[in-house]
Amino acid sequence: AAIQAAPEAFISVGMATTFFTQQLNAAGIEFSDIDSFTKSNGEAITNGKLVYLAGKYSSSVGPAFALVMNAINGNVIRDAQGNAVSLSQNYQVATDSETFDKFYKNDNGDNPIYSRDTLDQIIGDTVTFDTINEVVASN
């Protein structure tokens, strides 16, 4: 419906490329999205009208998985004030295919940022908040 109104641009928060890419490209309407660095988003930024993508690494859930595994195994990790852990992972932004490719190649199913080796560093009996925070900050 929004595309039928002939907008000059289209802004989406998640999955515009999944549902609207074909229609937006055919109509010549530039669009932006907050989504992941996926193959289809790469095609949209290279050959289509996707002009801005803010995304997270596909493996960004890795540290949360590590925190849960630690808690299950008896190492409940808290911050310095005794609160539940809160970590921030910034969005990566691509406005062209070259930048997109850099992020996509650095984190995909075959080569995740939070690989098994990385997760092994933050899962264990002696892991602390500082350890997990350092690993997340370095990625």
Residue ranges, per PLM feature:
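Stable alpha-helical elements in mature extracytoplasmic
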Residues: 16-20, 41, 61-64, 99-100, ...
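Short acidic/histidine-rich motifs immediately flanking catalytic phosphotransfer sites
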Residues: 4-9
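Hydrophobic alpha-helical segments within soluble ligand-binding/sensing domains
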Residues: 1, 37-44, 56-75
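Alpha-helix termini
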Residues: 3, 27, 47-48, 75-80
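Generic hydrophobic, helix-prone segments enriched in Leu/Val/Ile
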Residues: 2, 24, 41, 99-107
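Venus flytrap/periplasmic-binding-protein-like
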Residues: 10-49, 53
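Hinge/cleft segment of the Venus flytrap/periplasmic-binding protein
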Residues: 67-139
